[in-house]
């Protein structure tokens, strides 16, 4: 699947907010200091949560914590927790237990004496990186956002070796692919978006186009672990449906577990990427009627949509499109391509977890707007700000 924007050609803007690592800089990490999450833990109120006022104070703090997680602690307009969470009293009856807790559930958990750190971990677990693309440029050509670069991943018996089959027909190890990426000046890394589980609505997202652009990040991996996790996420989102077998998923899980054991406490971005891999792998298995490794890590809207999609009914198809594929609200006031805009091309393989790419030209339009707004190209390693 290839989608090209309708904008006019132009020169490629420079990416001033990120800098590609060079060989020998594998030890470089994201900025040191306290993350928004840790800062919120330290700032947690010490009120008596058994009282009504104490519970409300703690609930307000939890709301700020969730906002800090979803917006990186920045000063941008915050998304209310009510908008982030889809959970309600009927969530468990709908099999939607993976939704982010509401602010009232936060208060209840705190009133029951739930440790602050445990509560924060519960929030963070629902923050997921999605929609991975490799970014490639060439003089006088559209910027290519390729999600289908890797057509297959073969995993060694112990999960330590990953052999990649590229769309070009070439085979190489993950380490060789990482080395090649470091040497290619036209490979600008990856782009991904940060969502919560409830915001991923199968064929659409529960965000306006302006909010989605604010959630996009460039990552130019500076370690082989980060690079491997980006490739693995991208592959899970674009895997050929006939390749989704139990044995293949077991081997991918072994590779993921091997990578997770290399993640240190301070490697916050790597932990985010690994968490995304877990959600994607378990959701993919559930959508293909395979036993998921952890049913709590199935994206909630997919869990509800799966049985509906299996029923063949013309009336039901219209309902599913209305529930999961509509962008009517999210595209309000989206500008048309400018004459000086750089053209972009989106390349992806039709797969279970990337239905949003097939939904008209919505995602390619968002990518074009994001790429042609250089100040929006935020460095993923800067998500964790320094608190003084």
Curated annotation (Swiss-Prot):
A single GO cellular-component term from the record reads: host cell Golgi apparatus
Start-end of Polar residues biased regions: 1-18
**Bias (Basic and acidic residues):** 23-32
InterPro entries membership: Herpes_UL7
Pfam families in the record = Herpes_UL7
Q: Which residues form the signal peptide?
A: none
Q: Which residues cross the membrane?
A: none
Keyword tags:
Host cytoplasm, Host Golgi apparatus, Virion, Virion tegument
Cellular localization per UniProt: Virion; Virion tegument; Host cytoplasm; Host Golgi apparatus
Task: Specify where the region named Disordered lies, as residue ranges.
Answer: 1-55
Family the UniProt entry places it in = Belongs to the herpesviridae cytoplasmic envelopment protein 1 family.
Functional description taken from the UniProt entry: Plays a critical role in cytoplasmic virus egress. Participates in the final step of tegumentation and envelope acquisition within the host cytoplasm.
Q: What is this protein called?
A: Cytoplasmic envelopment protein 1
Q: Give the source species.
A: Psittacid herpesvirus 1 (isolate Amazon parrot/-/97-0001/1997)
Q: Which gene encodes it?
A: UL7
